[in-house]
């Protein structure tokens, strides 16, 4: 029983943030399961299913906050579990896993297009938009609005300590969109010239709270103070089913050396601690709308999305744990 090296490589890249962004993480996880199914040397269906569960568990343990990862695994593995429990043979189960992974990736990519279409309707000609971190869903909204001929400008925060704002700024600029790049702490200063805030999400809870890159909550709060609309762009697979049962979302704490270089940190007094949370929680009252591939909803409607999309998931143990 063996997990193929490509799965281990993808898991490591997710863990060390070479693969970043909730959507890309989810698609990469689904693709890893596809590779495991395609490359498995298992000689019988039981051995194959054990390998699939082991691969899914390794992927699951890489990042604790972004719910897109376990939701992608659930999508693929739940379909595999049904086939396995129904008596599928090795090749039948392999086919189900591969097809489920491809289907998830396809649906995820189409969701970005739909989010762009819905979100662009809320962007007006001449808008100055502020964004934070790097979200393909948020970028889709701005890119679609620009392609529709709307004259927009985007303020991009740098997003310390991993500088995801640089990725966003360069991507938006590559589409021809005018970009203003600012330090995170300048967000409030420039909010007075901002018309809309558009950001992504790593997870959305049952009450509509948004878990996203650290700094998101401060920008949303500042926007509320200035009466600027905050719009969160997120695929439905970023909604967190376990929060329906009262589970809290774990906020990932990352290595202090992402903030202070290791050599410098060694010279600091021992009574200084460096804390590096990767995410924060934006209360639903700071969010005006959530843009999904199913349409634009208010935060309090998150529970409806969860019931419809993931109600089934609450009835079963995780398909990689049984």
Swiss-Prot record:
Q: Name the catalytic site residues.
A: 133, 202
Q: What induces this protein's gene, according to its Swiss-Prot or TrEMBL record?
A: Up-regulated by nucleosides (at protein level).
**Activity regulation, per record:** Is highly activated in the presence of AMP, with an increase of >40-fold in activity levels. Among other nucleotides, isomerase activity is slightly increased in the presence of GMP, but CMP, UMP, TMP, and NAD(+) have no effect; therefore, AMP is likely the major activator of R15P isomerase in vivo. To a lesser extent, various compounds with an adenosyl moiety, such as dAMP, adenosine, or methylthioadenosine, can also act as activators. The regulation of this enzyme by AMP prevents excess degradation of intracellular AMP by the archaeal AMP degradation pathway.
Superkingdom of origin: Archaea
In its UniProt record, a GO molecular function of this protein is:
ribose 1,5-bisphosphate isomerase activity
One Pfam short name: IF-2B
Q: What else is known?
A: Reaction proceeds via a cis-phosphoenolate intermediate.
This chain's protein is named Ribose 1,5-bisphosphate isomerase
UniProt source species: Thermococcus kodakarensis (strain ATCC BAA-918 / JCM 12380 / KOD1)
């Amino acid at each position: 029983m063996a997990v193929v090296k490509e799965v281990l490589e993808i898991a490591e890249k997710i863990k060390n943030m070479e693969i970043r962004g909730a959507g890309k993480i989810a698609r990469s996880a689904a693709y890893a399961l596809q590779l495991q199914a395609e490359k498995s040397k298992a000689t019988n269906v039981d051995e194959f299913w054990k390998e699939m569960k082991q691969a899914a568990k390794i992927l699951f343990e890489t990042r604790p906050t972004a719910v897109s990862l376990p939701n992608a695994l659930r999508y693929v593995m739940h379909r595999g579990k049904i086939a396995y429990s129904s008596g599928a043979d090795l090749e039948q189960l392999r086919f189900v896993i591969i097809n489920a992974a491809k289907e998830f990736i396809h649906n995820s990519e189409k969701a970005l297009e739909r989010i762009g279409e819905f979100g662009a309707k809320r962007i007006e000609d001449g808008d100055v938009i502020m964004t934070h971190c790097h979200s393909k869903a948020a970028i889709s909204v701005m890119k679609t609005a620009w392609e529709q001929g709307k004259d927009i400008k985007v303020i991009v925060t740098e997003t310390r300590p991993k500088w995801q704002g640089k990725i966003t700024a360069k991507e938006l600029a590559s589409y021809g969109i005018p970009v203003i790049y600012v330090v995170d702490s300048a967000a409030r200063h420039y909010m007075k010239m901002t018309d809309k805030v558009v950001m992504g999400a790593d997870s959305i809870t049952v009450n509509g709270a948004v878990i996203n890159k650290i700094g998101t909550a401060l920008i949303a709060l500042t926007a509320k103070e200035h009466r600027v609309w905050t719009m969160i762009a997120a695929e439905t697979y970023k909604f967190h089913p376990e929060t329906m049962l009262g589970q809290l979302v774990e906020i990932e704490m990352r290595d202090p050396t992402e903030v202070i270089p290791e050599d410098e940190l060694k010279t600091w007094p021992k009574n200084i601690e460096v804390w590096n949370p990767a995410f924060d929680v934006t209360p639903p009252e700071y969010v005006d709308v959530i843009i999904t591939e199913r349409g634009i909803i208010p935060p309090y409607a998150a529970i409806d999305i969860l019931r419809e999309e993931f109600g089934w998931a609450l009835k079963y143990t995780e398909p990689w744990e049984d």
